[in-house]
Every structure is written in C-alpha cells, then in structure tokens.
Amino acid sequence: MKKTNFLSFGCYLPKKVLTNFDLEELVDTSDEWILRRTGIKTRYIAEEEDVCELAFRASLNCLERAMHFSQKEVDAIIVATCTANKRLPAVANMLQARLGIGRHILSFDVNAACTGFLYALSIVDAMIVSGKVSTVLLVGAEAMSTIIDWNDRNTCVLFGDGAGAVLVSAGDSGGVLYEHMACDSSLGEALLAEVGGTLKMDGRSVFEAAIKRLTLAIGEALKTTGISVEELDYFIMHQANIRIIELIGEKIGIDRSKIIVTVDRYANTSAASIPITLAYMDSHGSIRKGAKILFAAMGAGFTYGVTIFEY
C-alpha cells in the first residue's frame, strides 16, 4: 500500500507588510496589546493579487523546489480556501489553467476555513492510498483582508494574506499515521462571514472551543496510535493565536522547543497557515526525514482536525 509523502514545499507572501504600528493608525489599538494577546507582529496584505494569483505563485515556488519533477506529473490539484475570488469556477480550476496544465486532471477546492489544509490532506491521503492518484499539488491560499472589517479592532489585527503549497506524492514509507477530521456545528455562528459581508467572530467562544476540542482530539490521537508526546518531533498548529498554540502545547505536555510558531510573522492566514509554516521550516532546513509531526487546526464551522504525519 502506498504512503503519502511530502515531496516539496513552497509559499508566497504579498509585498505589503502591515505592522502593529500601522494598525495603531487605523483603529484604537496598540502594538503592546496586539502582541500580548495574539503574538502577532506583522502580517502581509495582498493589494493587487487575488487568491488564484497567491496560489499560483506559491505553486511555482513549490514546483521549482521539487528535484527532477515535471508539472506534467501532477494528477490532481486541490486548493483549500475560504476566500475564493470567484464563486465559480473553483480556484483550483483557475490555478490549473495558470500553470498551463492542459491535461484533464482532477482539480477542486475545499472550504473548511482554517482547518481546510488538514481536510484537504485527508482527501489527498485517501486518494493516494487507494491508488487513484500518484502526485497531488495541495495548496492553501487566502486573502483574508478581503473579508475583514478594517474598523473592527477585534478582528482586523488577527489576519493576513498568503499561500502555501505542498507537492504530495506516493511513497513506500512514512505518511499519515493518524487523522481525525470533524465539525461541531453547534458553534457554527461563532465565526462566520456572510456573502458580500465581513468576518464576525465571538472570540471567547472560539478560544474556549479550540482549547477544549483540540486538547481532547490530540489526546485521542496519541492514545489510539500509542505514540508518546516525547516521540513527536514537531507540533504544527494552525497559526491563529500564540495563546491558543502555547496553551494546547502545555496541556498535552509537549516540549516548547518542538512547537513551531510563525503567527508572529504572518498572522492568521487561515487555510494557508500550515503549508506556509512547512515551507518556512523547509527553507530553514529544519525538517528532518523520518520526523513525526503533529498537526492540529480549528476553524469556522466549527471544524477541527488532528493529523500525525511521518515525514
């Protein structure tokens, strides 16, 4: 049975950098307040690029990093996003065209908000294990700035734009060791954006639900697999808020040195945060072969997921 392997990583961040000090000029906030409550220092904002363009540039970066690989080998394209620039066609369809892949391959979007990348990875794993595909371009891309109310200091300080891409291929070892994707729909109104509207969030409910659901889900993952916290090499959470990341890390008892944090640089990029973080780690040479990675994410819906992956 084939295993799901990560072949290469790529990312793209827009040119405009918005600092906490810039936000002090827009709303009643301060660098000290934002940093203390979120851990965020900067975020990137797309002024000219739409989500498809962000996805395209991240994909090119990813494909360029893949050794001895031709994009003609891509069997499918999946884009995780909740900020598509068109209702139709899907961003993945447009990305396929931008990449010049004229063959009739599978391409579609996944919208599970901030959990989107893990939901999409679950789909990719099922397709590779079943033998349906051999190579998939998996992208998380978001233009969160397009659904933000820039007069709402409770939300505008949290989000950023960007895209991350992972080239996933069939291999003989490693891969997904465990995954659990779910949705607690009773919290569906806690975080939402109406069509044509801006994002609304009950921050307290989201914070408490994230801590509770993910701590329990991670505990179940470790119990089911028999993998101890000490055996994990990295803990990569959706980069929403440093307090959530650190508190869950503390609750599961993982060494702080294994917790990967990029929210300070990029803010909350929704479905793009995990692949951007992977690309960041790869560019710094910090992912070793055979490493066990614990992924966890939560997002609107209220979706959440946990994946244990051997690199």
From Swiss-Prot:
Per UniProt, what is one GO molecular function of this protein? beta-ketoacyl-acyl-carrier-protein synthase III activity
Q: What is known of its domains?
A: The last Arg residue of the ACP-binding site is essential for the weak association between ACP/AcpP and FabH.
Q: Where in the cell is it found?
A: Cytoplasm
Q: Per the UniProt entry, what species is this protein from, by scientific name?
A: Neorickettsia sennetsu (strain ATCC VR-367 / Miyayama) (Ehrlichia sennetsu)
EC assignment: 2.3.1.180
Sorted keywords for this record are: Acyltransferase, Cytoplasm, Fatty acid biosynthesis, Fatty acid metabolism, Lipid biosynthesis, Lipid metabolism, Multifunctional enzyme, Transferase
Q: What does this protein do?
A: Catalyzes the condensation reaction of fatty acid synthesis by the addition to an acyl acceptor of two carbons from malonyl-ACP. Catalyzes the first condensation reaction which initiates fatty acid synthesis and may therefore play a role in governing the total rate of fatty acid production. Possesses both acetoacetyl-ACP synthase and acetyl transacylase activities. Its substrate specificity determines the biosynthesis of branched-chain and/or straight-chain of fatty acids.
Catalytic residues identified in the record? C114, H238, N268
Per the record, the similarity remark reads:
Belongs to the thiolase-like superfamily. FabH family.
UniProt xrefs under Gene3D superfamilies:
3.40.47.10
Q: Which Pfam families match?
A: ACP_syn_III (PF08545), ACP_syn_III_C (PF08541)
Look up the coiled coil feature and give its residue ranges: none
* Pathway(s) annotated for this protein in UniProt: Lipid metabolism; fatty acid biosynthesis
Which cysteines pair up through disulfides? They are: none
- Annotated segments matching region ACP-binding: 239-243
Q: What is this protein called?
A: Beta-ketoacyl-[acyl-carrier-protein] synthase III
State which gene encodes it: fabH
